[in-house]
């Protein structure tokens, strides 16, 4: 799986964290492991330009998704197996997201992770134009974000335990050579 991030926003964000959450969602949604995704982080002016050009709406927004390939389960009928697909581009605006994060009472990192999940789901065909679609998409978005956070917490604790074990073993005389 290839996930590229281009940060043109001027904000210092954790690109590895964005890649981690995108990869987690793509894997959880059973997308082919050779799928490709591009993420671009823009400043408010550039995002406002995209928002007007593609959605005919003024001002910046938090996230926009641009699907690349038409996704078909299993690929072509005559294909031996599904091949890699370019899912598309997710465009994030950290400046706009920072304002939303402040209103919601959480960090910019949390908001960008949420928006990344949202963007990937759009690339996979989910939408929230209708109330039923919104309910389904937002519930899945919340579930995936919670699972990713739990996965990150578990990995953090495992790393800390490994470090404690290593320090303990380093102090032990049991493993010294005779």
Swiss-Prot record:
E.C. number(s) listed in UniProt: 3.1.-.-
EC category: hydrolase
Protein species of origin: Mycolicibacterium smegmatis (strain ATCC 700084 / mc(2)155) (Mycobacterium smegmatis)
Family: Belongs to the endoribonuclease YbeY family.
Top-level taxon in the UniProt lineage: Bacteria
Cofactor note: Binds 1 zinc ion.
Family matches, as PROSITE patterns: UPF0054
Protein's UniProt name: Endoribonuclease YbeY
